[in-house]
Amino acid sequence: MKQKKHVGKRLLAGLLGAVLLQTAVSIPSGLQASAADDVEYNYAKALQYSIYFYDGNMCGTEVAENNRYQWRGNCHTYDAQVPLQPMGEDKVGTNLSQSFIDQYRDILDPDGDGYVDVSGGFHDAGDHVKFGMPENYAASTLGWGYYEFRDSYKKTGQDDHIETILRYFNDYLMKCTFLDENGEVVAHCYQVGDGDIDHAYWNSPEVDTMARPAFFLTGDKPQTDYVASAAASLAINYLNFKDTDPDYAAQSLDYAKALFQFAKSHEKQLSDNADGPKSYYVSSKWEDDYCWAAAWLFKITGDESYLQEIYPYYDYYAAPCYVYCWNDMWNGVQCILGEISEDKPAKEGEHVYPQFIEKYKEAAEKSPYEEMDCWASVAKAITTYMTGGVGTITPAGYFWLNTWGSARYN
């Protein structure tokens, strides 16, 4: 079993390393001391540089105090004052109906100033829209990497930086989640900005004045992928801060549980049922995000009801069929279920369920004789990816999946 755990750790390192090193940005000269240039393959430097992508894309009223770039400042501060009204042709306001606003005004606008605050978070890429699916994916993946390999961040002096980024992500997710007096989700803002408007004009975010409508999901139009992926990030955030800031960690976990409960108790629907995504980041499934969140919540709580939510939707065969990305979390799910299936927890305080595969076979009516191993599936997925089985490997080693955002898959 010890050897199996070591295999799992190596597979996690390979998967998360490929995801993290997607970005290449210019770095402030004064912040490069911990990343020496005198080695052929400087992974410490690659780790350091990759995090600065998020400084470049940070948004809101607290950019200046949290950012490591001198040329970045507060931007889209008016996201803190989105008029709490149905949007018109000018795209000012929200996608909420007037009746919904009237019913939940005290929750959406507790200070009664007529606005809803959805400031913070991160821009998507070169544009300035805050898209929920890639944002939640990035938040959970960065958090996962820090949780699994915290010592590496500390040894390279990147722990303070990544914690700043993780707090900024997850503070935004909590701000965008509106709870009633019972702690139940009333609404969740999954997007700020309109892709069509934003992509028609390119400028510095600090001087942007374009309309930035806020899009919410509610019980009347639930979107499982958004709330589940946000729940996963907040659950991981609990693990990352439970020993250093227990009150903040507990708050993150409360929000994670509330968001997952919303996903569980409402009709399962995709993000393309609403008016925000249009053709931008329309998810093709919700099951992967749902299982992703449930697996983390079981790992934290040991509550087997979360595993019961996984059994009907878990696709054991999916991981090698595509890459780990915002629209396909199955490789991540497989890794966490691999850890859950072990005899002993990977880290102190985690919960395991060694009989998971057998229980899944029973629930999914699989043959009891079929061999299933989560880590073997992950290994197959990495081999398939590295050999171009789900994309094209160029002569220089660049992995090309499709024309849109190809660098994200390298």
Where are these regions (language model features)?
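Bacterial N-terminal signal peptides that target proteins for export
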Residues: 2-15
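Sec-dependent signal peptide cleavage junction
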Residues: 24-37
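Small side chains
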Residues: 14-17, 230
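Glycan-recognition and catalytic cores of secretory/periplasmic carbohydrate-active enzymes
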Residues: 35-136, 140-410
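Hydrophobic core
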Residues: 16-25
